[in-house]
Design a protein with these regions (language model features):
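Bacterial Sec-dependent N-terminal signal peptides
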Residues: 1-26
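Alpha-mannosidase-like glycoside hydrolase catalytic domains involved in N-glycan trimming
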Residues: 22-118
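Solvent-exposed beta-strand/loop surfaces of large extracellular or lumenal domains
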Residues: 57-86, 235, 282-298, 307-319
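Extended acidic/polar, glycine-enriched regions
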Residues: 82-123, 272-284, 293-304, 311, ...
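Beta-strand-rich recognition/accessory modules
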Residues: 86-92, 311-379
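Solvent-exposed N-terminal domain segments of exported/luminal and surface proteins
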Residues: 103, 108-206
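Extended, loop-rich substrate-binding clefts of extracytoplasmic carbohydrate-active enzymes
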Residues: 172-251
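Acidic (Asp/Glu-rich), glycine- and aromatic
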Residues: 243, 255-287
Length: 379
């Protein structure tokens, strides 16, 4: 009798999973644990978890729907450079301290416009550029080193006031230093780390590598673009150093995620800094070593407007220093000790973030959301 009862209990517990797998649907319970709304935020669900609930899923023929509103949500399969799918990415809105339910269903998904993109730009001196629906950036390559008058090191910003992807159009027309309605490049990098690049820092000096030498795209939209930039070894105060940067940008975000992996011929850790170019005229700064937070609202640049730049660590900074040309946030790197941070920019003429207050509020909210991620349960 007891064995029969146990068997029945096991069958009952397995029945919902069996029904879910056979019906071709999975319910995703989503909860927001913080007291602020989350807009256009990406969540990542391990693909193996999806396969466990929906083993027969057709990866090219499913859609994700909000059970309450019946609205279809955009999604992306993330590979991270691997042959097999790693994550299902879903972009969603969810109100403060609230819960929603989504459903994965069989069927042809709606067409959604790509919101992220990146590429190597051989026609422009080996740039590597990336963007989303909010902002665009580029890193400089080997080709630029042949033009000393134009030479620059750090991360550049291309401001936008459109949610359309603009990189290819701007490179094609060549003159992207004038705003023809969608934004422009007026940000000056020069011999600085620009809008949040990273480099070793020893004896009050930034040790810049040469510009990046190799690139690899791991994922390229529509909701997340991820790529790797690799650099040649260089000497840092008697230490030989290498770095590889894995950079990703999500749709709807002003900031990119950077994972910088440094290696050295010496075992000891060493200081590195994340830098933001500082202008001669006064701007507004919000610096917090304990929070690992560096925000800068630049002075207005004539008719071109104002750019806000910011960088965030998830751990406290060792120190933050203001020099003549840069804001520098120091942390520690070493072999097998990646530095993970977020950095990006905003433009007041996009009419979303229009003041130092709204920029600093955005940065603080961004970090709060990182520390309190959306919770996901597959039912």
């Amino acid at each position: 009798m007891n064995k029969l009862f146990i068997l029945l209990c096991l069958l009952c517990s397995a029945l919902p999973k069996l029904v879910s797998a056979q019906s071709g649907r999975v319910v995703i319970a989503v909860s927001n644990p913080i007291s602020e709304n989350r807009k256009e935020e990406l969540v990542a669900i391990p693909w193996n978890d999806i396969l466990t609930k929906f083993p027969g899923i057709d990866k090219a023929n499913f859609k994700i729907v909000n059970l309450l509103t019946k609205k279809e949500l955009p999604w992306q399969l993330e590979f991270k450079g691997e042959e097999k799918i790693q994550n299902l990415l879903i972009q969603m809105n969810i109100a403060a301290n609230s819960k929603i339910k989504l459903e994965i269903l069989k069927g042809k998904p709606a067409a959604f416009r790509a919101k992220t993109y990146g590429r190597y730009v051989p026609e422009r001196k080996d740039d590597f550029a990336w963007e989303n629906d909010k902002i665009a950036h580029r890193m400089y390559g080997k080709g630029l080193e042949q033009f000393p008058a134009e030479m620059a090191y750090g991360m550049d910003v291309w401001v936008k006031r459109t949610d359309k992807l603009i990189l290819n159009d701007r490179y094609k027309r060549g003159n992207y230093h004038q705003d023809i309605g969608d934004g422009m490049d007026y940000y000056h990098v020069g011999y600085t780390l620009g809008s949040g690049d990273i480099a070793p820092y020893v004896n009050d000096s930034v040790f810049y590598p040469k510009n990046y030498r190799r690139w690899k795209i791991l994922d390229n939209g529509p909701l997340r673009t991820t790529f790797i930039l690799s650099y040649d070894e260089w000497n840092v105060n008697g230490r030989n150093v290498n770095v590889t940067k894995r950079i990703s940008i999500d749709a709807g975000s002003q900031l990119s995620r950077v994972e910088a992996m440094f290696s050295s011929d010496q075992k000891s850790a060493f200081p590195v800094v994340i830098g933001i170019a500082k202008r001669e005229n006064p701007g507004v700064m919000l610096l917090d070593e304990q929070q690992g937070f560096m925000g800068y609202w630049e002075p207005q640049f004539g008719q071109d407007g104002t750019t806000g730049v910011g960088s965030l660590l998830l751990t406290p900074a060792t120190k933050i220093k203001i020099t003549n040309g840069q804001l520098l946030m120091q942390t520690t790197a070493g072999n097998d000790l990646p530095v993970i941070y977020y950095t990006g920019a905003a433009w007041n003429k996009a009419n979303e973030i229009t003041s130092s207050k709204t920029w600093f509020d955005y940065l603080q909210s961004f970090k709060n959301r990182l520390l309190n991620p959306i919770k996901i349960v597959l039912e």
